[in-house]
From Swiss-Prot:
Annotated motif 'HIGH' region, positions: 122-132
GO cellular component, one term: cytoplasm
Similarity comment text for this entry: Belongs to the class-I aminoacyl-tRNA synthetase family.
Name assigned to this protein: Arginine--tRNA ligase
Annotated disulfide bonds: none
Catalytic activity: tRNA(Arg) + L-arginine + ATP = L-arginyl-tRNA(Arg) + AMP + diphosphate
Aminoacyl-tRNA synthetase recorded as keyword: yes
Single GO term (MF): arginine-tRNA ligase activity
Protein species of origin: Francisella tularensis subsp. mediasiatica (strain FSC147)
PROSITE patterns: AA_TRNA_LIGASE_I
Top EC class of this enzyme: ligase
GO terms under biological process: arginyl-tRNA aminoacylation
Length: 581
């Protein structure tokens, strides 16, 4: 139950009764703790339509609200705010209801939808680096949130395995080892099962090949021709390319596993290749595509969005072509209600072109919503894209090692590597996901690793503190679900209990905002606020030495609720919580 929605529906009945438009009855969490828990600001915009002062409208609404079981206090403030304070029993009962529900008050979406999430997107032959974490972590959080809310999710890594960089690699290896059978057009036998290069060698070859092609137009033409021949199915090139893909996937899977990020599909641009001819024929048959200076293009029919080149002059395909073919494939195979791309905002124009063409040509069905979650860049303290101290790109494996080092330095007596791993992951993931994805942000691992402030380790420390209370009382193998039947939250005895209860029942609000806006930072902000509320409760509300048994059990119930809410929230952003720290 989203408490904001519940209160809005309660007020909407009064608005309707008084002849006011119900949509103005929206209730939101109060921006000022000193005036109430929630507020309704609808009287101000409503005044224009009702031809009455907003203060008079607000007072009229409050006079007609009859819900003493929900509201302890309803106050009107100039120019027309309605400040709402919940009844203590309603607040406690709602907290109990959430504690005893599987998803802490969150209800499944109805009807359930099928959502395809395209994220990760590493390129073949390139090791994953710090710049990849935004797509990986943001996409993983979104798939967790969508599944939690009841959607059927299909996640696809969508490898970059079919562009000009493949031709560059082929030509560079041919230059180094022309004797390899992959380059003999007359060879008809079986190709070797072992790759002629390792993934480490591939990572060294690509920069060299790229530099050569950028400095020599003839070398670039060779790479383009090799790419074209690969895409046309030249046997030796296909066999060599398959080695590139296999060893690259093995490497990036290890990187993703280290982040606890997993995919349902491991497809790439190449998997859409077999659909391109079918799709082009469809475009031609329906007069969507036309020739322009030797290339084949499709208009987007949108101002400011240029036509999309589908086939180049040389017959090769563009990234937009494979992206369209991927949409074609997904529509046929999966028939999704929504496809979400988690990709750098620098690709925004590209996706506007692809989405416009896909919708105009009916490549996707009318029910299918296309969305680009366009995230900002990861920058260092200098405001530039994050680099190592030596000025190079930091590989993901090195970043994780550094995070573990920070965790170990702060806990030198901790010998459990799994706990160090959990702290390191919380450091990286929370440090990234606390930011609104649309913004660039400064990646400061030293700051993210602090055990105080808005950090992952601070969240872990708080939950471990709450868990330790329960462990001292119930032992190591306690089960919150069964215990909650006998431990109930009661009306708050002080402001610390009240604020903790109030924070606990706002969990579904955070989840809904994260779900609807593809913004996991709402979950992070919620978890941080809950951690703060619990720590104040912990300091000011003793448990173990209480003589009042009913109060003691009520506070234990609040500890249970905190552990449950924090555990679910942390899991939604891919963070696991240790038992001890």
């Amino acid at each position: 139950m989203n408490i904001e929605n519940y209160l809005s529906e309660t007020l909407a009945k009064v608005f309707q009764k008084l002849g006011y438009v119900e949509s103005f009855a929206k209730v939101v969490t109060s921006t000022r703790e000193d005036v109430g828990h929630f507020q309704c600001n609808g009287a101000m915009p409503l005044a224009k339509f009702a031809k009455k002062p907003p203060l008079a409208i607000a007072e009229e609404i409050v006079e007609h609200i009859d819900a003493e079981d929900i509201f302890a206090k309803l106050e009107v403030a100039k120019p027309g705010f309605i400040n709402i304070t919940l009844a203590p029993k309603f607040l406690a009962d709602t907290t109990n209801r959430f504690l005893n529900s599987n998803k802490f008050g969150v209800q499944n979406n109805l009807p359930n939808r099928k959502v395809v999430l395209d994220f990760g997107g590493p390129n073949v032959a390139k090791p994953m680096h710090v710049g990849h974490i935004r797509s990986a972590l943001l996409g993983d959080a979104l798939q967790r949130i969508h599944r939690f809310c009841g959607d059927t999710v299909v996640s696809d890594v969508h490898l970059g395995d079919w562009g000009t960089q493949m031709g560059m690699l082929i030509e560079e290896i041919k230059l180094q080892s022309p004797q390899l059978v992959y380059f003999d057009e007359n060879y008809t036998g079986e190709y070797p099962t072992e790759s002629p290069v390792t993934v480490q060698e591939l990572a060294e070859i690509y920069p060299r090949a790229s530099k050569r092609c950028k400095s020599d137009i003839n070398e670039m033409e060779k790479a383009r021709l090799a790419t074209f021949e690969l895409q046309q199915g030249r046997r030796g090139y296909v066999a060599l390319w398959q080695h590139f893909v296999r060893i690259s996937i093995d490497a990036v899977k290890k990187d993703f596993d280290s982040l606890d990020v997993h995919f349902d599909l491991w497809l790439g641009e190449s998997d859409a290749n077999k659909f391109i001819d079918e799709m082009i024929s469809y475009f031609q048959a329906n007069n969507f595509i036309y020739e322009d200076e030797g290339a084949w293009v499709i208009d987007t029919n949108k101002d400011g969005v240029p036509p999309l080149i589908v086939i180049k002059k040389d017959g090769g395909v563009m990234y937009g072509t494979t992206d369209l073919a991927t949409l074609w494939q997904r529509s046929k195979d999966l028939d999704p209600d929504e496809i979400i791309y988690v990709v750098d905002k620098r690709q925004s124009l590209h996706f506007k072109q692809v989405f416009s063409v896909a919708e105009r040509t009916k490549v996707v069905s009318e029910k299918c919503k296309l969305k680009h979650v366009a995230f900002g860049t990861v920058n260092g303290k200098d405001g530039r894209p994050f680099k190592t101290r030596e000025g190079g790109v930091m590989h993901l494996a090195d970043l994780i090692s550094q995070a573990k080092e920070y965790a170990k330095n702060r806990m030198p007596d901790e010998n459990d590597d799994s706990i160090i791993d959990q702290i390191a992951m919380a450091t990286i993931k929370f440090g990234d996901l606390i930011n609104n994805y649309a913004n660039d942000y400064f990646f400061d691992l030293e700051k993210f690793a602090q055990h105080e402030g808005k950090t992952g380790p601070y969240l872990l420390y708080t939950v471990v503190r709450a868990k330790s209370i329960l462990r001292k009382i119930f032992g190591d193998n306690y089960d919150i679900k069964s215990l909650a039947k006998d431990y109930k939250v009661v009306n708050a005895h002080n402001e610390y209990e009240e604020k903790l209860q109030l924070q606990l029942i706002q969990f579904p609000i955070a989840v809904q905002r994260a779900y609807e806006n593809s913004q996991p930072h709402h979950i992070c902000e919620y978890a941080y606020s809950l951690a703060n509320s619990f720590n104040k409760f912990y300091v000011n509300c003793p448990i173990n030495n209480l003589d009042d048994e009913s109060l003691k059990k009520a506070r234990i119930a609040l500890c249970m609720a905190t552990v449950k809410a924090m555990t679910i929230a942390s899991d939604l952003i891919g963070i696991s919580i240790p038992e001890r720290m």
